[in-house]
From Swiss-Prot:
Catalysed transformations (reactions): 2-[(2R,5Z)-2-carboxy-4-methylthiazol-5(2H)-ylidene]ethyl phosphate + 4-amino-2-methyl-5-(diphosphooxymethyl)pyrimidine + 2 H(+) = thiamine phosphate + CO2 + diphosphate; 2-(2-carboxy-4-methylthiazol-5-yl)ethyl phosphate + 4-amino-2-methyl-5-(diphosphooxymethyl)pyrimidine + 2 H(+) = thiamine phosphate + CO2 + diphosphate; 4-methyl-5-(2-phosphooxyethyl)-thiazole + 4-amino-2-methyl-5-(diphosphooxymethyl)pyrimidine + H(+) = thiamine phosphate + diphosphate
Protein name (record): Thiamine-phosphate synthase
The entry's keywords: Magnesium, Metal-binding, Thiamine biosynthesis, Transferase
Family: Belongs to the thiamine-phosphate synthase family.
Cofactor notes: Binds 1 Mg(2+) ion per subunit.
Gene3D superfamilies, sorted: Aldolase class I (3.20.20.70)
Stored PANTHER family: THIAMINE-PHOSPHATE PYROPHOSPHORYLASE (PTHR20857), THIAMINE-PHOSPHATE SYNTHASE (PTHR20857:SF15)
Lineage of the species this protein comes from: Bacteria, Pseudomonadati, Pseudomonadota, Gammaproteobacteria, Pasteurellales
Native organism: Pasteurella multocida (strain Pm70)
Sites where the protein binds Mg(2+): 83, 102
Positions annotated to bind 2-[(2R,5Z)-2-carboxy-4-methylthiazol-5(2H)-ylidene]ethyl phosphate: 148-150, 180, 200-201
Amino acid sequence: MKPVHAFMRLYFIAGTQDCLHLDGDPAQNLLNILQQALQSGITCYQFREKGKKALQDPDKIKALAIQCRDLCRQYQVPFVVNDDVQLAIDIGADGIHVGQTDMAVADVAALCHSHCFIGTSVNTLEQGIAAQANPLIDYFGTGPIFPTQSKEDPKPVVGVDFVSTIRAHGIDKPIVAIGGVTTQTAEELRRRGANGVAVISAITQSADIAKTVKELLGNAQ
């Protein structure tokens, strides 16, 4: 597997709750969007089935996650599970992403037995310093950079300067910038030190996924 920083160039996150604006079955819509995104060049995908409008049946969630995993494997793109460590283990995910209020990273690592790379979310400089010092954390998502409607409980906006601040404090682990990122802002975030950007609605709501992915990758292609 490539170094983790190579996967961060364009990190796509989505679940069925992000596909409700489309007609038809949300699960099938997610699979269709994911396949188009993979064909177009995303470098990592995180299965994030979360919130009141997401699937609630564990069996349906697992079945859909397996379909997403299999699509990612066809394109040799890492498949990451958000928060649900047991699901990640059960279906052989490549990575697991946990927030500050999810399972402790040490517990995640103990369960995964080094089979998954581990990412976490960072919203403050103090969290970034702690993530840098924790050898179990392979990368972290910083944000939200801009206001976002994709999450039900978004943290305070940190702005583009936060990425520069993180780097200025000697934090050199792979960083993916997330939260309201668009084709107009992705390159600026990379210039400030992010290894890449993570998006939800920029792709799920795109009328031309191939074009959007190309623009989000920009000079990182």
